[in-house]
């Protein structure tokens, strides 16, 4: 899909928009605990340079329910984070904050269950809406990291 968005310094630009389902980012240490091995198994590349979906999945469990087959994304991070939707949060019985990735203050506690072990961590968030673009494109368009941009999506719900 391609959508238009307006950058005040440039005008109308076209970008591809992707939707990210629930997923998790893990540290190498937590991954080794959950899976009993040290390396992620590459499944497919993501749109973000250097990022990938792994073959590995976990179960996430909250006070009221659980969700299976939550994809682990790579590479390893310096923090553990589970990104869910508002609907997922309701099913799990949690009230996670809307946050930028990596900002875990107030994150909901979730149990992450792998094939070898499990761990409970304050790691559940709803990811704030954001756009991934290359440094070169950001420079060309005159935007910097974390700068708000206006996005207009054509369609019935415009």
Task: Describe the role of every protein-language-model region.
Residues 16-63, 68-115, 120-152, 158:
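Short beta-strand-centered segments at strand-helix junctions
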Residues 2-9:
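Short, positively charged and aromatic/hydrophobic N-terminal segments
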Residues 9-10, 29:
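Intrinsic disorder/low-complexity segments enriched in polar/small residues
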Residues 13:
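Catalytic domains of riboflavin
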């Amino acid at each position: 899909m391609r959508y238009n968005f307006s950058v005040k310094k440039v005008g109308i630009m076209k970008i591809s928009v992707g939707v990210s389902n629930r997923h998790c980012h893990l540290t190498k240490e937590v991954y080794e605990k959950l899976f009993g091995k040290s390396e992620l198994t590459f499944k497919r590349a993501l749109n973000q340079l250097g990022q990938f979906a792994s073959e590995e999945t976990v179960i996430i469990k909250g006070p009221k329910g659980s969700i299976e087959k939550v994809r682990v994304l790579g590479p390893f991070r310096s923090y553990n984070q589970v990104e869910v939707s508002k609907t997922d949060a309701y099913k799990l019985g949690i009230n996670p904050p809307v946050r930028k990735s990596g900002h875990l203050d107030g994150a909901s506690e979730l149990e992450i269950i792998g094939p070898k072990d499990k761990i409970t961590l304050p790691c559940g968030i709803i990811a704030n809406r954001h756009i991934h673009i290359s440094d070169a494109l950001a420079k060309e368009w005159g935007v910097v990291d974390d700068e708000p941009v206006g996005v207009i999506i054509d369609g019935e719900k415009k």
